[in-house]
Amino acid sequence: MARARRVKRDSATNIYRTCKQAGTCPPDVLNKVENTTIADKILQYGSAGVFFGGLGISTGKGTGGTTGYVPLGEGPIRVGGTPTVIRPSLVPDTIGPSDIIPVDTLNPVEPTSSSIVPLTESSGPDLLPGEVETIAEIHPGPVVPSTDTPVTTTSRGASAVLEVAPEPTPPSRVRVSGTQYHNPSFQVITESTPAQGESSLADHILVTSGSGGQTIGGTASDLIELQEFPTRYSFEIDEPTPPRQSSTPLQRIRTALRRRGGLTNRRLVQQVPVEDPLFLSQPSRLVRFQFDNPVFEDEVTQIFEQDLNDFQEPPDRDFLDIRSLGRPQYSETPAGYVRVSRLGQRRTIRTRSGAQIGSQVHFYRDLSSINTEDPIELQLLGQHSGDATIVQGLTESTFVDVNVDENPLAEDFSISAHSDDLLLDEANEDFSGSQLVVGGRRSTSTYTVPRVETTRSASYYTQDIQGYYVSYPEDRDTSKDIIYPMPDLPVVIIHTYDTSGDFYLHPSLTTRRRRKRKYL
């Protein structure tokens, strides 16, 4: 039996819209849309006895209740508190209706009336203000008391003299200010003709005295640093600086880095250091045996053609199967040395079509640095102009007159000081560890001691007796042979010239100790 496929029902809102008018809504859809579920009824009945308005518990949207939400960081809302009203600093004007201006009703214009409107006749109110009343207060000046001036009269016929007292002048304050702009191209003589011994022009004043003068004012001269010229006898040795390869090596460094990055790639190019000095002058002699012109230096890419059937061993094993050798490239190592590089191509594999395949090889050699010698201080040799010295013996020498007849030291010596005791040698010689040789060169007697071959190393014990010297065997005298007691090798070998009495035992007489094994 096949199980029926379950079809998902539409949403409760869409079902409620279509079934509400027909009255065929399912009870779950009706309760959910109209908020009549068991949970909604519990909240409705419980809210009648308990107030949860501030908590925002309801079936509606979350608005925080009637008072809203409290922002974070602020305290709770105080019940019954009055907010503080901020009053403006200026007194606001009262806003009200404007003054009502009455407007007269105009009579209707008759057809027979004139169309000219007189401008002087106006029955409307005057919008401009009327006559303005001006009030001026007059303050009288201070009353100056009158001063009686005495009048002098005389009966004589002379002229009358009137003494008039001057009026007192109030004190006045005068302030003088000046502004000066310096113009270096124009100078104005601000003083009159200078007097004797004084000159004043602009800002430069020169006061002279009996011994000298000093400049006052003006711009002080800049002091420049003077260079001291060294004399012929004092000089400085400059430290050697590393030579610069180029003035602007930016582009060359980038080019060298590109070349170096391609040659030093160990994943694609084989790195082979070369110690043979022929790599710098004649690298072709490292690939094959040939005659090269020592005067000609080839700096182009060299191609070596060789038949694979005719195999030849190269002079250097590192240059085996080299097909081409590139031109020299110069670069700088991290240690600061100059590196000479050549890129080679091997022909290790040959396909049926005739193509030759091989890896790339980077041959390089680092050149040693040329160390600069430490500078030494040189001295002047010979005589130069201005260096001649004239020595005057009469003026620089000192002569002391010595009286030979009078000897002040002769009084301390007695006549016995000139005796033969002064000629005696009081030194003591020590001849310990010395050898005394008497006579000249004499003939010496030489005896040859035969060498005895033993199992041990040969040793000789010689003694120097009565001035004879024993030398080691150089020429053997066959006439003097040692006579053995038996024709075979002796059992015991005794040194005839040895006084210590040592001997050697024949190896056949030594008994060997056998190892005893307890457990077989």
UniProtKB/Swiss-Prot annotation:
Sequence similarity: Belongs to the papillomaviridae L2 protein family.
Q: Which InterPro entries match?
A: Late_L2
Question: What is this protein's record name?
Answer: Minor capsid protein L2
Q: Which GO terms describe its molecular function?
A: DNA binding; structural molecule activity
Q: Where in this protein would one find the motif Nuclear localization signal, according to its record?
A: 1-10, 511-519
Q: How does it assemble?
A: Interacts with major capsid protein L1. Interacts with E2; this interaction inhibits E2 transcriptional activity but not the DNA replication function E2. Interacts with host GADD45GIP1. Interacts with host HSPA8; this interaction is required for L2 nuclear translocation. Interacts with host importins KPNB2 and KPNB3. Forms a complex with importin alpha2-beta1 heterodimers via interaction with the importin alpha2 adapter. Interacts with host DYNLT1; this interaction is essential for virus intracellular transport during entry.
- Record's function text: Minor protein of the capsid that localizes along the inner surface of the virion, within the central cavities beneath the L1 pentamers. Plays a role in capsid stabilization through interaction with the major capsid protein L1. Once the virion enters the host cell, L2 escorts the genomic DNA into the nucleus by promoting escape from the endosomal compartments and traffic through the host Golgi network.
Subcellular location(s) of the protein: Virion; Host nucleus; Host early endosome; Host Golgi apparatus
* Biological process according to GO: microtubule-dependent intracellular transport of viral material towards nucleus; symbiont entry into host cell; viral penetration into host nucleus
Q: Which gene encodes it?
A: L2
- Keywords on this record? Capsid protein, Cytoplasmic inwards viral transport, Disulfide bond, DNA-binding, Host endosome, Host Golgi apparatus, Host nucleus, Host-virus interaction, Late protein, Microtubular inwards viral transport, Phosphoprotein, Viral penetration into host nucleus, Virion, Virus entry into host cell
**Any S-S bridges, and between which cysteines?**
C19-C25
Keyword set includes DNA-binding: yes
**Under the cellular component aspect of Gene Ontology, which terms does the record hold?**
host cell; host cell endosome; host cell Golgi apparatus; host cell nucleus; viral capsid
Source domain of life: Viruses
Q: How is it modified after translation?
A: Highly phosphorylated.
